[in-house]
Curated annotation (Swiss-Prot):
PANTHER family: ALPHA AMYLASE DOMAIN-CONTAINING PROTEIN, GRANULE-BOUND STARCH SYNTHASE 1, CHLOROPLASTIC/AMYLOPLASTIC. This is Glycogen synthase. Transmembrane segments: none annotated. Belongs to the glycosyltransferase 1 family. Bacterial/plant glycogen synthase subfamily. Signal peptide: none annotated. The gene is glgA.
Length: 480
């Protein structure tokens, strides 16, 4: 089975969030099931580990300039395609924003070109490989199913479209329709029209043959008027083809026994080595040695991620002689609130603005618990990384967090199945109760260690999760 994986980012080449981890891990996991998945990625200027390539297709003009599809053969027998279009992707800054954090004004055209190339590959433009299925991710790839459905080519491969976060919708003005190579009659409710504008995510949801999102709970939430963010009605209409499939993680890449960024390696049989990592983290940030727990946050600092709940809980955390290390950036007001708290309480709170992959691993390996108080969370990977590294996740009861964590209530603790602490994010002080519970359990060493053990034993691998994708691909092919 041949599958084209269409994603605007994929680890290790380019990463801004969880989409990259998923898109980067799927091909290797699916290869174990004899699925030849090849990823198409824009050739951004900021690509890391750019592999050796050879051109396999040339465009004289693709959305305003010459472009080429490049092929790279990777270790492990995998193949990567890069869309090399310097006029669209050879720029300073990130994949979606300039060096000042502003969205590129032509993002719609940049990713329409990406989608056009994906559709061309799907229709057999490459000399020696044509996919049986196309798997497209998020709004940046939303026009792939649209271009294929609106084309006159036959046959065409079925398209699976995955929603990683419904909040990012790729909405652009109606007057860009022709510039995006969309026909006039596509601008309708049964097309790309979205409240008088063009919805690139909506296009993917409407035209794809099947839909997935990244957890069963989130699949239910986005069919409601509140969780659907303007697309709930469409998703209810498409409920028969909407599947909630949990994300996994690369258990080899995320392994505290071999992680090169971790000071002291450990596994579930040598948890005592985590104390070395905790002290290294405290030393790095000038925190006191303490008998209280060290909490960690690795997150975008936004309201969606519940960072305001963290700010509201800081006086309680400080009063309990607990500590907090934060890695992230985002909303300037929330970020400034955390920085101010760190300045006021430098021996208990530390904040690193931005993102640093090595530091994230050090926080996972040294923090006693990770705070993930999201208001909504499609799947979440942070809680999976936390469990893998022996940090107890404290999560809100939403989306994939609710699907992957077993709350440490009395019954679950007695049965030895608890993996974290869960709470309902329904009030401005709602994080205080789980923090209080976590601090109490932390001082009950036997229970806390069982939580760590159970989390580290949890199989969150793509090897396990990928079987659901293989079954869905097979079902899609059988319908053709």
């Amino acid at each position: 089975m041949r599958v084209l994986n269409v994603a605007s980012e994929a680890y290790p080449w380019i990463k801004t969030g969880g989409l990259a981890d998923v898109a980067g891990a799927l091909p290797a996991a699916l290869a174990e099931h004899d699925v030849d998945m090849r990823t198409l990625l824009p050739a951004y200027a900021g690509l890391r580990q750019r592999p050796e390539t050879r051109p396999v297709h040339h465009y004289a003009d693709l959305f305003g300039g010459a472009a080429s599809i490049l092929e790279a053969r990777l270790t492990g027998g995998l193949t990567l395609y890069l869309l090399d279009a310097p006029h669209l992707y050879d720029r300073p800054g990130g994949p979606y924003t300039d060096a000042n954090g502003r969205d590129w004004a032509d993002n719609a055209e940049r990713f329409a070109a990406f989608c056009r190339a994906a559709a061309d590959i799907a229709l057999g433009i490459l000399p020696d490989w044509t996919p049986d299925i196309v798997h497209a991710h998020d709004w940046q790839a939303g026009l792939v199913p649209a271009y294929l459905a609106l084309s006159e080519a036959s046959p065409r491969p079925p398209v699976l479209f995955t929603i990683h976060n419904l909040a990012f919708q790729g909405v652009v003005p109606r007057d860009r329709l022709a510039a995006l190579l969309l026909p006039p009659d596509s601008f309708s409710v049964d097309g790309v029209e979205y409240y008088g504008q063009i919805g690139l995510l909506k296009a993917g949801l409407h035209y794809a043959d099947a839909l997935t999102t990244v957890s069963p709970s989130y699949a239910r939430e986005i069919q409601t008027d509140t969780g659907g963010m303007g697309l709930g009605g469409l998703l209810r209409d498409r409920a028969a083809v909407l599947n909630g499939l949990l994300n996994g993680i690369d258990m080899t890449e995320w392994n505290p026994a071999h992680d090169p960024h971790v000071k002291a390696h450990f596994d579930r049989h040598s948890l005592e080595h985590r104390t070395i990592n905790r002290e290294a983290l405290r030393t790095r940030f000038g925190l006191d040695s303490s008998a209280g727990p060290l909490f960690g946050i690795v997150s975008r600092l936004t309201g969606q991620k519940g960072i305001d709940l963290v700010l509201n809980a800081l006086p309680f955390l400080i009063s309990q002689q607990a500590q907090l290390v934060v890695l992230g950036s985002g909303d300037k007001g929330l970020e400034q609130g955390l920085l101010q708290a760190a300045q006021t309480h430098p021996r208990q709170i530390a904040v690193f603005s931005g993102y640093d992959e090595a530091l994230s691993r050090q926080i996972f390996s040294g923090a006693d618990a990770m705070l993930i108080p999201s208001r909504f969370e499609p799947c979440g990977l942070t809680q999976l990384y936390a469990m893998r590294y022996g940090a107890v996740p404290i999560v809100s009861r939403v989306g994939g967090l609710a699907d992957t964590i077993i709350d440490a209530n009395t019954a679950a603790c007695e049965a030895g199945v608890a993996t974290g602490l869960m709470f309902q994010p329904d009030g401005e002080d709602s994080l205080i109760e789980p923090l209080s519970r976590a601090i109490r359990l932390f001082h009950q060493a036997e229970i806390w260690e069982r939580l760590q053990h159970r989390g580290m034993e949890t199989d969150s691998s793509w090897t396990l999760r990928s079987t659901a994708y293989v079954a869905l691909y097979t079902r899609l092919l059988s319908l053709r």
